[in-house]
């Protein structure tokens, strides 16, 4: 176990530690996944399961032990007031189980998302799909990496897309929208692929898809870790993302990730 730190270093050791935390949370999730336990509804009518709560406990306790002076914001925890958060330069942003609908549907497309936010941008991030044993990891200046079934990590390197290239579009499995359909009439589309959770960001990073347009509201913990993987997949320089973090509502109104414009 790494010694407690006030601020995690942006180094390989921190990536390894972050991976270990995500895998521990994944183990907690899979214990409930195999038990096929029922879901409940939160006040906002979104689903929550015992797996969400178990992963939240694993992650928040591990982060508090590792970086005790860095605040943690988790979807399943108490949310600090915006005025309090505006004084933070760095904080952890966590979705313990992103894709609860996918968890309930038992299609494997749910993830553990953990990101370190520094001055409004994600600088460390891990996305782990425990049912698929698939992990994506990134850090500022450290690149983006993919690891399948605890095999060797593979570096993810993107290349700019020439204008007019027919695009493979990543889209949400659970959130179709008329706005998306309208947008897709304005760009050349080669094919469309669907997935749950933050895997869509990772697909852009590894070149499995070219663009991920999302319309409608999302929360920052839904996207931060995947956004970090996307940003650090650039070939020699970070990729440009429209997303910023620690906004007053901790939310986004829509975004387009990838495509030729992301590499300008």
Q: What is each model feature region?
A:
Residues 88-130:
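Glycine-rich active-site/cofactor-binding loop and its immediate structural neighborhood
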Residues 29, 52, 63, 100, ...:
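Residue-level signal for inorganic ion chemistry
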Residues 42, 75, 172, 194-195, ...:
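Conserved beta-strand termini and adjacent loop/short-helix elements that scaffold enzyme active sites
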Residues 38, 71, 168, 188-191, ...:
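Conserved beta-strand segments of alpha/beta enzyme cores
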Residues 1-20, 181-186, 201-264:
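Oxyanion/phosphate-interacting regions
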Residues 114-202, 251-264:
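Acidic beta-strand-loop-alpha-helix segment within the catalytic core
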Residues 1-97, 178, 182-185, 261-262:
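N-terminal subdomain of lithium-sensitive/metallo-dependent phosphomonoesterases centered on the IMPase/IPPase/PAP
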């Amino acid at each position: 176990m790494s010694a407690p730190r006030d601020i995690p270093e942006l180094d390989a050791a921190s990536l390894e530690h972050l991976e270990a935390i995500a895998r521990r949370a994944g183990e907690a999730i899979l214990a409930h996944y195999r038990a096929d336990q029922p879901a409940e509804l939160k006040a906002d009518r979104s689903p929550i399961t015992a797996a969400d709560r178990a992963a939240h406990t694993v992650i928040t306790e591990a982060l508090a032990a590792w970086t005790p002076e860095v605040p943690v914001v988790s979807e399943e925890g108490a949310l600090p007031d915006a005025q309090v958060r505006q004084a933070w330069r760095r904080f952890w942003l966590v979705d313990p189980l992103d894709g609860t609908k996918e968890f309930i549907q038992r299609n494997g497309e749910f993830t553990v998302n953990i990101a370190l936010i520094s001055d409004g941008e994600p600088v460390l991030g891990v996305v782990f799909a425990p049912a698929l044993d698939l992990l994506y990891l990134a850090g500022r200046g450290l690149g983006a990496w993919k690891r399948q079934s605890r095999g060797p990590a593979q570096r993810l390197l993107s290349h700019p897309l020439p204008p007019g290239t027919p695009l493979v579009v990543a889209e949400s499995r659970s959130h179709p929208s008329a706005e998306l359909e309208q947008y897709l009439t304005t760009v050349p589309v080669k094919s469309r692929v669907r997935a749950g959770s933050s895997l869509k960001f990772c697909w852009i990073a590894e070149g499995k898809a070219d663009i991920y347009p999302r319309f409608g509201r999302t929360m920052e913990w839904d996207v931060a870790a995947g956004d970090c993987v996307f940003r650090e997949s650039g070939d020699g320089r970070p990729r440009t993302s429209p997303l910023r973090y620690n906004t007053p509502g901790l939310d986004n109104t829509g975004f387009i990730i990838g495509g030729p414009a992301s590499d300008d």
